Amino acid sequence: MELRVGNKYRLGRKIGSGSFGDIYLGANIATGEEVAIKLECVKTKHPQLHIESKFYKMMQGGVGIPSIKWCGAEGDYNVMVMELLGPSLEDLFNFCSRKFSLKTVLLLADQMISRIEYIHSKNFIHRDVKPDNFLMGLGKKGNLVYIIDFGLAKKYRDARTHQHIPYRENKNLTGTARYASINTHLGIEQSRRDDLESLGYVLMYFNLGSLPWQGLKAATKRQKYERISEKKMSTPIEVLCKGYPSEFSTYLNFCRSLRFDDKPDYSYLRQLFRNLFHRQGFSYDYVFDWNMLKFGAARNPEDMDRERREHEREERMGQLRGSATRALPPGPPAGATGNRLRNVAEPMASTPTSRIQQSGNTSPRAISRVDRERKVSMRLHRGAPANVSSSDLTGRQEVSRISASQTSVPFDHLGK
């Protein structure tokens, strides 16, 4: 049965979950262009998709920010249609047997720092920096890192005066415990420093394959978060980064040294890793581990140089667009969402089949697990035709980008 959104997009199969709501594959009925469609039941207790769409709109024009194509309500669902992206870094990490080379980690670090800096320049903090929330582009943008999921983003300063939000303690905060900063565990209001500290843990996760505070057992979630907090605070940075270049420990020490309202020196952090990159003799050819694993043959040097120039040009153009973009209406004030439980996907009251305009009489065909894994693997080919025909949308099944064990969840102040 064909499902339509806004009488313009055809709804396909579920491909993932965000902080609030589920994400489906879709296609423009007129052009066949594939898109991602995020749905949220209008009857959900704490509607969030409209707020998230405002965040995305405020971020438009930045490099590595997905474009928003349509927002509105359809039946009993709030809907956001956005640019379709490739696999997440968590997907790719698993594809590469849960270990990235130093070159790949440094290539990613450079772009990820820039994405976080851009969000901060727009007066927001992300508050859920993790591998699942960074996706690679498709086709010609296959080497570009995107940042997604602004369901937990928060305004940290006034757009006009740049007045910073006040320091607070005893906060009930949200995020993913594995990558949360130490101050977040302590219940301190999050600021720019916390996004960057979380990124430091993500980079070491890519280096190590896992973090020392993973896999801890506890009777309750609260006790588990307490154990994670204790392990994280008792693990010296030098121990965490042992066996890896000192730049990683320097990065984390720098992040932890920042005061609450300090503006991080993003250029210093980028240059830290760039200098290491050059000392290692690496080339900015944007060949990541998943490219080599899937296609081991070396590429033409002219192609690699062209891609490097295109990437640098896109970065420059994005910065110009971002600075020239007219200010949009500000999002909700800091703390406007209150202390409700905020980072668990709300269950849908019913399936989209019963709520969104229906037409046609095609039923989805069953797809085996092997076929699903093959399709996910096919997405990893940089520059390959990652899209499928619109007619196959009802038959395409993707593996959720966010596993249950890594979904962001709220956690209470651990000092209580």
Swiss-Prot record:
It catalyses: L-seryl-[protein] + ATP = O-phospho-L-seryl-[protein] + ADP + H(+); L-threonyl-[protein] + ATP = O-phospho-L-threonyl-[protein] + ADP + H(+). It comes from the Eukaryota. PROSITE patterns: PROTEIN_KINASE_ATP, PROTEIN_KINASE_DOM, PROTEIN_KINASE_ST. ATP binds at residues 15-23, 38. Keywords: ATP-binding, Biological rhythms, Cytoplasm, Kinase, Nucleotide-binding, Serine/threonine-protein kinase, Transferase. Its EC number is 2.7.11.1. It is found in: Cytoplasm. Residues 350-365, 400-409 have a biased composition (Polar residues). It comes from Gallus gallus (Chicken). This is Casein kinase I isoform epsilon. GO terms for biological process: endocytosis; positive regulation of canonical Wnt signaling pathway; positive regulation of proteasomal ubiquitin-dependent protein catabolic process; protein phosphorylation; rhythmic process; signal transduction. GO terms for cellular component: cytoplasm; nucleus. Residues 9-277 form the Protein kinase domain. Residues 301-318 have a biased composition (Basic and acidic residues). Residues 324-338 have a biased composition (Low complexity). Belongs to the protein kinase superfamily. CK1 Ser/Thr protein kinase family. Casein kinase I subfamily. It is an enzyme of class 2 (transferase). The active site is at 128 (proton acceptor). GO terms for molecular function: ATP binding; protein kinase activity; protein serine kinase activity; protein serine/threonine kinase activity. Casein kinases are operationally defined by their preferential utilization of acidic proteins such as caseins as substrates. Can phosphorylate a large number of proteins. Participates in Wnt signaling. Phosphorylates DVL1. Central component of the circadian clock. May act as a negative regulator of circadian rhythmicity by phosphorylating PER1 and PER2. Retains PER1 in the cytoplasm.
